[in-house]
């Protein structure tokens, strides 16, 4: 992932799997390693079922996180990592709306949307 200072950080997981449709594509991740200070934001999604705007599987009782945070994902209650939010340009990315955009909360917080990110499954 790249922030708006063009600083690059990374996170890697030794185990990543997505369950079958019958289990709503439940995510399982473990074995985190990453660049200094990045924090393991994706592990908060481990064990969660996939949520979309029309099919809510998150643990938030009052709302659908996929609607609130503008993108489908394996949400718990609040997104610690949300790569599918609406892309924000520089003027909107820092200090903008709470948890909107592309976030990796444990390093950048909820008011910072990343400039770039890439996710690979090998």
Model-derived segments and spans:
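Mature extracellular or lumenal effector domains of secreted proteins
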Residues: 1-122
